[in-house]
A protein has these predicted regions:
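Mature, structured domains of secreted/extracytosolic soluble proteins
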Residues: 1-401
Length: 401
């Protein structure tokens, strides 16, 4: 149950105008009390064995954020995109309880979203963790920030907070807003993939996650400036004028928007690598894995600086001469490849003759130390980032490395 109580709203600096937006104009004062979308019209009626609070209507259980999106007539596009990030998972505990109650022999499956914060436990034993594998145990291409179907969602924190302290929030563009964006700022995706069905998950999730907010209390309308791009941490510029209406769920609030905010990932120099990094079929999946996993995104997605990025293809990543082996008796060559099952980059190392350009295939040695792979990739990417442009006729340029 979602409670809007005066003391709590004061503590979280929720204003009268915030409450007006959240209740779609039904309340304008934080002195009001709201429980699950219903206003308390007479409170603290004292009885011999407790208190009665009179509400203005019949109070019903609230849907979660995913259910709100699924049932709204103007959120069909966002609901479809959410569905691409989900799968039904067999729940053994729920199956046993269901069959016990109904004397049946059926199986119970629970819809869950691939997410960095999700319920990884079974029925009756919720556990917060990362859901990074599909029901068959295969690693997924990308994850949402959190699972909007989890009724007990609370962001990961070190303060010991549980679901009673806060909730999530979702910015859901209307179908009309999505159609407008698809033919304007999103035209590059339309030109490359043709339809939403064909946009790869690792590309799509960038757009989804910019609309998923970990905390509700810190991002109410008066604090919209706190809603930032996931990588650049620059404010999106969301205003109440962009909000059509609000819907309170049991695990967070859903804001229906009349516009789509484009993630910085779609405008940065690394975008060509992103859209060519789709698993085993991507021709730049190796280098983009490095950009995505070695914390280069905040740097490359910055719109306040000008960079040039040299992007090697997967084929080029088979010919990396290890600079650490220069000046030694045996120069080493790395062949980096993308392991689509594990969703990670692996490498083999070979002896290499610099003079002849011949690789000694018999010297193949698998690099089992993941940190060594990351170290070489990080050094390489540092030297692929040029400060400024590379079109002014100079022979040498300053790199990040």
């Amino acid at each position: 149950m979602i409670h809007f109580l005066p003391a709590n709203m004061k503590h979280n600096k929720i204003t009268d105008s915030d409450l007006a937006t959240l209740t779609n104009g039904e309340s304008n004062f934080v002195s009001d009390v709201w429980v699950n979308g219903k206003k308390i019209v007479d409170r603290d009626i004292t009885c011999k064995n407790g208190y009665i609070h009179k509400v203005e209507g019949v109070m019903t259980s609230a849907d979660n954020m995913a259910d709100i999106v699924a049932s709204h007539a103007n959120m069909k596009t966002f609901n479809y995109l959410l569905g691409r990030c989900s799968a039904p998972y067999y729940d053994d505990a729920a199956t046993k309880e269901y069959n016990r109650l109904y004397n049946n022999t059926d199986s119970v499956f629970v819809l869950r979203h691939f997410a960095s914060t999700a319920n990884t436990g079974n029925y009756g034993a919720a556990t917060s963790g990362e859901l990074a594998h599909d029901p068959d145990g295969q690693a997924v291409d990308a994850k949402l920030l959190y699972d909007p179907t989890w009724n007990q969602y609370i962001y990961s924190n070190t303060s010991g907070y549980d679901l009673h302290y806060d909730a999530g929030a979702m910015l859901v563009p209307s179908d009309k807003a999505f159609n407008t964006w698809w033919n304007a700022d999103g035209k590059v995706l339309q030109d490359m993939y043709g339809s939403w069905d064909k946009v790869p998950m690792n590309v799509l999730v960038k757009l989804m996650n910019i609309n998923m907010i970990n905390t509700f209390s810190e991002t109410v309308p008066s604090k919209f400036k706190n809603i930032v791009d996931n990588t650049t941490k620059v404010s999106l510029g969301l205003t109440t004028a962009d909000v059509d209406s609000c819907f309170m769920g049991c695990n967070g609030v859903v804001y229906l928007l009349n516009k789509v905010y484009t993630p910085a990932d779609y405008r940065s120099v690394s975008f060509p690598a992103l859209i060519n990094s789709n698993g085993a079929d991507g021709i730049m999946s190796v280098i983009y894995w490095g950009i995505d996993n070695l914390n280069f995104e905040p740097y490359l997605n910055s719109m306040d600086s000008y960079y040039s990025l040299i992007i090697p293809t997967n084929k080029a990543m088979l010919t990396y001469v290890d600079p650490c082996s220069y000046g030694t008796n045996r120069t080493k060559l790395y062949r980096f490849t993308y392991n689509n099952q594990r969703k990670t980059v692996v490498a083999n190392r070979y002896d290499y003759d610099l003079a002849t350009g011949v690789v000694d295939e018999a010297s193949k040695d698998s690099v089992t130390n993941a940190d060594q792979v990351k170290d070489r990739l990080e050094d390489l990417i540092d030297n692929l980032i040029v400060v400024g442009n590379v079109e002014d006729g100079h022979t040498y340029y300053k790199t990040k490395g």
